[in-house]
Structure formats: structure tokens, C-alpha cells
A protein has these predicted regions:
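Bacterial N-terminal signal peptides that target proteins for export
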Residues: 3-16
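A general, composition-driven signal for non-globular sequence regions
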Residues: 1-4, 55
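Primary mode marks residue(s) on the alpha4-beta5-alpha5 output face of response regulator receiver
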Residues: 33-244
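Bacterial N-terminal signal peptides
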Residues: 15-25
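Sec/Tat signal peptide C-region and signal peptidase I cleavage site
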Residues: 26-33
């Protein structure tokens, strides 16, 4: 049965980065079967696409305040993977992540409704984002969940999945995203995500009573992700305070 921390992690990551793009190989494929999924198989690929590239660009930019996302590079999902839709000047990269950015055990791994706007800073764009971009290529080429997991395990064994660089973080402040069927309205809370080499959650006080930070550390991956809710969405409107 899914724990409250697992639910919180799924709402926040999508992410994934669920966070598999963000935290590759969170769990084995058999764990996905332990939770009865409403999405046991991938939907037709068209259901994962956004009809208008302009709409996808706007949704991606909504992940962070305009002062950050406006001059950021934007990637949108094409036929075979993500493609550059807008060049950037500040080192940030904004995308709309799909459901396969979640952990392998996530019951919503194939949820075609998920749209998770994220803006990565330069460090995470170099060291965290590429794992998700590669996974997307596998999905669009028709890979199954088991094949994706096997390839990820092989990449980990070959040390092709790097540790996050120092200072790696991203913004998830969009009011318009859909992170999970379980999240209220689909978009949970505006939050920042910090990626560090695998470490104990207690080093940040994550998950302790009253602590405004949560964390997730996969069993196989080299990444620990910390989530810090903030008080406003990217458009400046206030968010409902989170109960600690």
C-alpha cells in the first residue's frame, strides 16, 4: 500500500521527477504490480502530446516566474524526443514533463493526463534532466516499462547516469500543471526541488514534524530529491499554506 510520503513524492515530482527522470530507477518493475494501477499500459502516444507547441511553451514557462522562465531555453516533445522550441540566455531549461518521469513503482507511470511544468537551473539541466530526456526517447520508440527499467539499470551499472552537480535545483510553481490524479486539482503546491548526491533525508530534517521540507531517495539511483513548498505560484498569486 502506498505511504503518505510516497503520495507526497508523486504529487511533487511527477516527478518524477517522480522522479525517475530526476531520480532514475526508484524501484523495481515488480513493485508497480503491487499497486493496482488504473494505467497498466501506455496510452496511444497522441494522448501524451500537447496539440499546440505554443501552448506547450507557455505551460513550460509557467513553472517559474517570468524573470526566470522568460529568458530560459524551452524544450517541447517531438516525434522522437524533446526538441528545442526556444533558445535561452540564462542557463535555465523549461519543459513539460510527462508521467514516465515518475518512479517505476508509480501507479500513474502511464497516466496520459499528467503535465508537469518544470524549469531546471543550469546545473540540473546538465546533470539531472538528461536522464528524463533519454527515457522519453525510449517511450516514444515503443519501449515497455520493463524495458525502460532494464535500460536504466544498465545505464546505472555503466555509470552513464551522473550524480547531480552541486547547486542542482528546479522550479515547479505552475498553477496549470497536472501532477497526479491524487493531488487536489492535479497541481499540489508550488515548490522548489533540490537534487543532491544520495544522502540521508535526516541531514535536511526532511519529513520531521513542523519541517517545511520533504525528501525522496530512490533505492538504486545516485540522487536524493528535497522538496520545499513555497507561498506563491509563478504568477504571484498566493498558494494555500501547507500543513506541517
Amino acid at each position: 500500500m502506498e505511504t503518505s510520503m510516497q503520495r507526497n513524492s508523486r504529487w511533487m515530482a511527477a516527478v518524477a521527477t517522480g522522479v525517475a527522470m530526476l531520480t532514475a530507477a526508484i524501484g523495481p518493475a515488480w513493485a508497480a504490480e503491487a499497486v493496482k494501477s488504473p494505467y497498466p499500459n501506455p496510452a496511444p502516444l497522441e494522448q501524451y502530446r500537447i496539440a499546440s507547441q505554443a501552448d506547450e511553451i507557455a505551460l513550460a514557462r509557467s513553472a517559474a516566474p517570468p524573470s526566470i522562465s522568460g529568458p530560459a531555453k524551452v524544450l517541447t516533445m517531438g516525434a522522437h524526443g524533446y526538441e528545442t522550441a526556444a533558445k535561452g540566455t540564462n542557463g535555465f531549461v523549461c519543459i513539460v514533463e510527462r508521467s514516465w518521469g515518475s518512479g517505476f513503482e508509480d501507479a500513474e507511470f502511464w497516466n496520459p493526463k499528467e503535465r508537469s511544468p518544470i524549469c531546471f537551473n543550469a546545473a540540473s539541466a546538465r546533470s539531472v534532466l538528461p536522464t528524463y530526456l533519454q527515457r522519453t526517447k525510449w517511450v516514444l520508440a515503443g519501449a515497455t516499462l520493463l524495458q525502460i527499467e532494464d535500460r536504466t539499470r544498465a545505464a546505472l551499472a555503466a555509470r552513464r547516469i551522473p550524480r547531480p552537480e552541486i547547486g542542482s535545483m528546479c522550479y515547479m510553481l505552475s498553477k496549470d500543471g497536472y501532477l497526479s490524479d491524487s493531488a487536489a486539482g492535479g497541481h499540489w503546491k508550488p515548490h522548489l526541488m533540490f537534487f543532491v548526491p544520495k544522502t540521508e533525508l535526516a541531514t535536511w530534517g526532511a519529513g520531521l514534524p513542523g519541517a517545511p521540507v520533504m525528501g525522496d531517495s530512490g533505492r538504486l539511483d545516485p540522487v536524493t530529491v528535497f522538496y520545499v513548498p513555497v507561498g506563491a505560484w509563478s504568477d504571484g498569486t498566493p498558494a494555500t499554506p501547507m500543513k506541517m
